[in-house]
Curated annotation (Swiss-Prot):
Family label: Belongs to the metapneumoviruses glycoprotein G family.
Glycosylated residues in this chain: 74, 118, 360, 445, 466, 478, 524, 570
Major localization class: virion
Residue ranges, compositional bias (Polar residues): 110-132, 299-326, 443-464
Biased composition range(s): Basic and acidic residues: 72-86, 94-103, 226-241, 265-274, 364-376
Region (Disordered): 67-491
GO BP term (any one): symbiont entry into host cell
Subcellular location: Virion membrane; Host cell surface
Transmembrane parts of this sequence: 32-54
Protein's name in the database: Major surface glycoprotein G
Keywords assigned: Glycoprotein, Host-virus interaction, Membrane, Transmembrane, Transmembrane helix, Viral attachment to host cell, Virion, Virus entry into host cell
Species in which this protein is naturally found: Avian metapneumovirus (isolate Canada goose/Minnesota/15a/2001) (AMPV)
Subunit structure, interactors included: Homooligomer. Interacts (via N-terminus) with protein M. Interacts with protein F; this interaction occurs on the surface of infected cells. Interacts with protein SH.
Entry keyword annotation includes Methyltransferase: no
Length: 585
């Protein structure tokens, strides 16, 4: 208690002292001044801090805008670059399946194809190898029948636009000739360079003989095409054309999968051989793209059809086919096609030789096969040339191939397999791709007669493939228009297979001249292109000028029937030629 009392007393004393001190006038003034000073200082500091805060925020925001985004962009660019680099390096093809197939199985077809493609084009050798690897991998994985694995060596090399298709064709060609099939891919590779064209043609015949295998091949080719438009993608296309073209030469693996009766083989082989002969003749011809026009009319139709199947897969497929055909081959095809515009007769003559030479005609076939492969070759000029070459070859097939062709022109790429088996022609397979699987296959079977009747119309299919240069396109267009006019009823019957859906690549603002099949050519009719399920307006029909006005960049299938031509400074030709890089198929 005492302590507390003392403490209380001390505190009271302190309070009293403070009160007394405050009461003094001096102290009051000083305290007042101090308080004012503190308040003013606080206010000024608050103001300064707020100003500084605003300014600092602005500065920070500027720094963030300028500095931060740049690093992010750089990182993104770097990452993208790495990704892109990895993607291109690792994957030649766009489709995942194709990639897997490449890694898993680069085999016989690739080996055989690589040499042949190398023969076709120096630039294509590497591409051919890669494309071959992809195509073969897909074929092997899908078909479950693996061609000889010895061919893998070529696969690691560049994926040539021609090579993938060539590889498949080579393996297939080898198969039709039992000894060839027995021969290891190594032999094929060695032989293919010399006889790549023949082998390719044979393989196409083989593919045709085996509808199931052909379908598988076509799908694979399509997958590859999707991945690398110009390089590996085109490879796939080549495979498809080969598969379609080579009914007789169904590869061993394809034979195992599904092989038509030997009789069909012989017929398809004959057709394939015809194609080869025409192609070889064309090979001698010089101009790659433009020269096609004359052969294109009859032969180009088949080729275009083939191109149609391949291109739909990715424009790349077509390029590969084109690359396959050297300018010379394409020219030869054109040359043959011109004499053989009706082509069926000339082709028929050639057919016996090729059929007989299935084993020995590997070299000849290789040249012609180059032409056949050309449709799937990837070089733009070669692509068109190749399509022409194929068409030229097809003119021989025109009687048989034309029957097959109507399905071929219209077919959806997916349907290419069935079309290929039925037709045994590249054109058939191509047609199938364009058509829906259900429609295309029935059309092929039902349109065999129609196709023959439509042969006169085939100039339109030729135009569809736009693998011909504008020059070449014009003669085919004239034929097709005359044919179309001559047999409108047949065209209407056949159009589902032959005329449905034109395929155009890239922007073309040229006027497109159409030789119509009925429902599409009316005023204000809109032409539609289907691109991966998307419907894009491609143009409209003007009855005053009798032209289809093209809107521009569209890629896909046209829902309208008829072949489309465009008027260019270079003259009348297919849309692709008018645009320099865009094709109808």
């Amino acid at each position: 208690m005492e302590v507390k009392v003392e403490n209380v007393g001390k505190s009271q004393e302190l309070k009293v002292k403070v009160k007394n001190f405050i009461k003094r006038s001096d102290c009051k003034k000083k305290l007042f001044a101090l308080i004012l000073g503190l308040v003013s200082f606080e206010l000024t500091m608050n103001i300064m801090l707020s100003v500084m805060y605003v300014e600092s925020n602005e500065a920070l925001s500027l720094c963030r805008i300028q500095g931060t985004p740049a690093p992010r962009d750089n990182k993104t660019n770097t990452e993208n670059t790495k990704k892109e680099t990895t993607f291109h390096t690792t994957t030649t093809t766009r489709d995942p399946e194709v990639r897997e197939t490449k890694t898993t199985k680069p085999k016989t077809n690739e080996g055989a194809t690589s040499p042949s493609r190398n023969l076709t084009t120096k630039g294509d050798i590497h591409q051919t190898t890669r494309a071959t690897t992809e195509a073969e991998l897909e074929k092997q994985s899908k078909q479950t029948i693996e061609p000889d694995t010895s061919t893998k060596k070529h696969t690691p090399t560049r994926p040539s636009s021609e090579s993938p298709t060539t590889t498949q064709a080579t393996a297939q060609l080898t198969t039709p000739t039992a000894p060839k099939a027995s021969i290891a891919p190594k032999n094929r590779q060695a032989t293919t360079k010399k006889t790549e064209t023949g082998t390719t043609t044979t393989s196409r015949a083989k593919k045709t003989n085996n509808p199931t295998e052909t379908a598988t091949t076509t799908l694979k080719a399509t997958t590859e095409t999707g991945k690398g438009k110009e390089g590996p993608t085109q490879h796939t296309i080549k495979e498809q054309p080969e598969t379609t073209a080579g009914e007789t030469t169904t590869p061993q693996s394809r034979r195992t999968t599904s092989r038509p009766a030997p009789t069909t083989k012989t017929e398809e082989e004959a057709e394939t051989t015809k194609t080869r002969t025409t192609k070889s003749t064309q090979t001698s011809t010089g101009p790659p793209g433009p020269t096609r026009s004359t052969p294109s009319k009859t032969a180009t139709e088949n080729n275009k059809r083939t191109t149609t199947i391949k291109r739909p897969n990715t424009a790349n497929t077509d390029s590969r086919q084109q690359t396959r055909t050297t300018a010379e081959q394409d020219r030869q095809i054109q040359t043959k096609a011109k004499p053989t515009t009706n082509g069926a007769h000339a082709q028929t003559t050639t057919t016996p030789e090729h059929n007989t030479d299935t084993t020995n005609s590997t070299k000849e076939s290789s040249k012609e096969d180059k032409t056949t492969r050309d449709p799937s070759s990837k070089t733009p000029t070669d692509q068109e040339d190749a399509s022409k070459g194929t068409t030229a070859a097809n003119p021989r097939k025109n009687t048989e191939a034309n029957t097959r062709t109507p399905p071929t022109t219209t077919p959806t790429r997916h349907t290419t397999e069935s079309a290929t088996s039925t037709t045994g022609d590249k054109t058939k397979a191509k047609t199938t791709r364009w058509k829906s699987t259900a429609d295309r296959q029935p059309i092929r079977n039902s349109t065999t007669a129609e196709t023959k009747t439509a042969q006169s119309k085939q100039p339109t299919p030729k135009q569809l493939s736009n693998n011909t240069t504008p020059e070449n396109t014009t003669p085919p267009n004239n034929k097709s228009s005359s044919q179309t006019d001559a047999a409108p009823t047949e065209e209407i019957e056949i159009r589902s297979s032959l005329w449905r859906r034109r395929y155009v690549y890239g922007p073309c603002r040229e006027n497109v001249l159409e030789h119509p099949m009925n429902p599409c050519f009316k005023d204000n009719t809109t032409w539609i292109y289907s691109d991966n399920g998307r419907n894009l307006p491609a143009g409209y029909y003007d009855s005053k000028t009798d032209k289809i006005i093209c809107y521009g960049i569209y890629r896909g299938n046209s829902y309208c029937y008829g072949r489309i031509e465009c008027t260019c400074k270079n003259g009348t030709g297919l849309l692709s030629y008018c645009c320099n890089s865009y094709n109808w198929s």
